A protein has these predicted regions:
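NAD(P)+-binding Rossmann beta1-loop-alpha1 motif at the extreme N-terminus of oxidoreductases
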Residues: 1-60
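Electropositive phosphate-/nucleotide-binding environments in soluble metabolic enzymes
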Residues: 11, 15, 35, 58-59, ...
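Rossmann-like NAD(P)(H) cofactor-binding subdomain of soluble oxidoreductases
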Residues: 51-139, 157
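Internal alpha-helical scaffold of NAD(P)-dependent oxidoreductase catalytic cores
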Residues: 90, 114-122, 141-228
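General beta-strand structural signal in soluble alpha/beta enzymes
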Residues: 98, 123-128, 168-172, 231, ...
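NAD(P)-dependent Rossmann-like dehydrogenase/reductase catalytic/cofactor-binding core
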Residues: 191-192, 220-230, 234, 238-314
Length: 314
């Protein structure tokens, strides 16, 4: 029986999941974007200060999908559509899920809509929740959500993703889980700005509480169940990302609080800041649905240099 997994995307999340799940599979194919990246990572053969196990194979060819029981996408949202386009002729009936967060930058759609466009015969499935890649590798206990409208699909992926230290919960609200995973990154930038300005826990509490309201309003407008936002992929992920400096988004906000330019703040982080990439897309969707998101609007003004960090928070 085939017991191999393909993970597309060898960044922090893809690598962390390859390491965490390596004991559950005979082979894990970890795909990079091109041969040069594959060769470089193959020589390094480690990520997040931990070596890859011997059954993790670095590659760049989608042909390895033909030898896998499942495919997990862990690319940035900007690459999600192109990945689906490139693999649609290889996957046949192979189950596919993703840990990618955000909206499709080309269409402003949620990613399950992009998925349905390219893979009409598959059941979309997203995996999201309050986790950091570094802590997954360190095997610190955590919980995550597997969301799909199809019960067999979410049960399948729950079994794949769950380990002794990573507990998987299932949810049928694929819209709500995606909205939570995207909006929380923007709110974490706001939390980072407040922290960088030296404001205290009460400010963080207010931002998280009112931010949750913004997230919920948008999600419900898009068809989500408001209860979803009280769970791991809503409040749980929001609290984590707003409260810990392992979050790139929070660190980015702290950089902005120093009154430096957005470009300089991004350079200082030197990694993908998902909340910044999602910011304009989320607000575009919110405005088109007449949803007010004042915290997110203030984050946009700060990144565009149209207001100061202090004015935005106060």
């Amino acid at each position: 029986m085939n017991n191999s997994l393909t993970i597309i995307g060898a960044g922090a999340w893809g690598s962390a999941l390859a390491i965490a799940l390596s004991h559950k599979f005979d082979k894990i194919f970890l795909l990079t974007k091109d041969k040069a990246s594959s060769d470089a990572l193959g020589k390094q053969h480690s990520a997040l200060s931990k070596p890859y196990s011997q059954n993790i194979f670095i590659d760049y060819s989608y042909e390895v999908i033909n030898h896998s029981k499942a495919v997990l996408i862990a690319t940035p949202s900007s690459a999600f559509g192109s990945v689906l386009k490139n693999i649609k002729d290889n996957v046949n009936d192979i189950p596919i899920a993703w840990v990618t967060k955000g909206f499709d930058p080309e269409t402003a759609n949620l990613l399950h809509e992009t998925f349905n466009h390219y893979l009409t015969g598959h059941h979309p499935c997203v995996i999201s929740g309050p986790t950091f890649a570094a802590e997954i590798v360190e095997e610190k206990p955590a919980a995550i959500v597997v969301a799909s409208k199809d019960k067999k699909t979410r049960d399948f992926w729950s079994d794949i993703i769950q380990t002794e230290t990573l507990r998987a919960y299932t949810n049928s609200d694929i819209v709500g889980v995606q909205v939570g995973g995207s909006v929380k990154n923007i709110l974490a930038i706001a939390a980072g700005i407040a922290s960088g300005l030296g404001f205290g826990a009460k400010t963080q509490a207010a931002l998280i509480t009112r931010g949750l309201a913004e997230m919920t309003r948008l999600g419900v407008a898009l068809g989500a169940d408001k209860i979803t936002f009280q769970g791991l992929s809503g409040l749980g992920d929001l609290v984590l990302t707003c409260s810990d400096d392992l979050s790139r988004n929070r660190r980015f906000g702290k950089e902005l609080a120093n009154n430096i330019s957005t470009d300089d703040a991004l350079k200082n982080i030197n990694a993908t800041v998902e909340g910044f990439k999602a910011l304009k897309l989320v607000l575009k969707v919110a405005r088109s649905n007449q949803i007010e998101m004042p915290i997110c609007e203030q984050v946009l003004l700060v990144t565009e240099g149209k207001t100061t960090p202090k004015e935005a928070v106060t």
